[in-house]
Every structure is written in C-alpha cells, then in structure tokens.
Amino acid sequence: MVKSIWVAGGCFWGIQKYFDSIKGVRHTIVGYSQGNVINPSYEQVCTQTTNHTETVQVDYDDRFVSLTSILEHLYQIIDPFSLNKQGEDIGNQYRSGIYYVDHEDALIIKNFLLQKQNQTSKKIMIEVHKLHNFNIAEEYHQKYLDKNPNGYCHVNLSLSKKRFN
C-alpha cells in the first residue's frame, strides 16, 4: 500500500533527491509545512515569520520500504542534534521534523526516536507532530537537483545506497 510521511531536515532540495533514490519510494514533492500562513511563498518562508519548515512529502510503498527504514535514512542524513540548522542552512524553516497523519505512524516514529535517544546523551532535536498543513513549493524547487546537478546540497547522497530493514 502506498503511504505518505512528511520529513524535514534542512534545505529540501537534497532531502528530495536522496529519497527519490530509495527503493520503494514512489513519489516526492517539496513544500512548506506546519506554518501559520496559507500558501506562503519561498520569500515569505525565508523571513522566518510564518513558522513553516521546508518539508518533503515522501510517498512510499510499504511492501518495499518500511516507515522505520525511511526514518533510519532521514536520521543518517541530518544532524539530529541540531536545532534550526542543517549544513550551511540556518533558520527555523530548516528545523528537522517528522510529520504524520496516521496514529499508527506516530507510534512508530516516537518509538524509533526513543530508541535513538536511549543510545546517546545528546538531546535529539527532531520535532514530531501531526501534519498541520502542507503547501506545495514553487515549481522551480521541485526536483531542483535534477534540474541543477551542481546545485547546493547538504546531504551526502551516496548514503542512499545503505539498506535498512
């Protein structure tokens, strides 16, 4: 069955490119979530006054990739201990988060992060919330690194080759 989860971890260009290469991911789209302005522009989000985060909607076939596997992938490509910063990107729109619509997904996410937290003394700064809203970003942001192969990317894309059960 195809399911959706929304993930954030810095600039959405690299996150989208990374998840597009994961077996079982059927579709991704970048946008702005969790904010207090309807259909914000990129420029509005960059003012850090709308409370949106750059987010990637990941549609995946759970027969081929599990939610836990997707969470492992996200965890390996971001700094989970950083607040409002990933790579060179600084600001609340670059915070790390996992957003869900299904209650059973919430339990999986919370258990996953609890396990990770128990393995470290550092505080994990990934927010977990029910998806409040998701506004699709402008077309020029969609598949940005496919259109601009030399574009900025804070994500180590070669890590997508690693498999998680």
Curated annotation (Swiss-Prot):
The family note in this entry says: Belongs to the MsrA Met sulfoxide reductase family.
Gene Ontology CC, one term: cytoplasm
Q: Its domain of life?
A: Bacteria
Question: Taxonomy-wise, where does this protein's organism fall, top ranks first?
Answer: Bacteria, Bacillati, Mycoplasmatota, Mycoplasmoidales, Mycoplasmoidaceae
**Keyword hit for Oxidoreductase:** yes
Is Oxidoreductase one of the keywords UniProt gives this record?
Answer: yes
* Enzyme active site: 11
Coiled-coil features, chain-numbered ranges = none
Key words, A-Z: Oxidoreductase
Broad EC category: oxidoreductase
What InterPro entries has UniProt attached to this entry? Answer: Met_Sox_Rdtase_MsrA_dom, Met_Sox_Rdtase_MsrA_sf, MsrA_MetSO_reductase
EC no.?
A: 1.8.4.11
Its name, as the record gives it, is Peptide methionine sulfoxide reductase MsrA
Q: Name one GO molecular function term.
A: peptide-methionine (S)-S-oxide reductase activity
Q: Which organism is it from?
A: Ureaplasma urealyticum serovar 10 (strain ATCC 33699 / Western)
- Gene Ontology process terms (BP): cellular response to oxidative stress; protein modification process
Q: Which PANTHER family match?
A: MITOCHONDRIAL PEPTIDE METHIONINE SULFOXIDE REDUCTASE (PTHR42799:SF2)
Q: Which reaction does it catalyse?
A: L-methionyl-[protein] + [thioredoxin]-disulfide + H2O = L-methionyl-(S)-S-oxide-[protein] + [thioredoxin]-dithiol; [thioredoxin]-disulfide + L-methionine + H2O = L-methionine (S)-S-oxide + [thioredoxin]-dithiol
Q: Tell me, in a sentence or two, what this protein's role is.
A: Has an important function as a repair enzyme for proteins that have been inactivated by oxidation. Catalyzes the reversible oxidation-reduction of methionine sulfoxide in proteins to methionine.
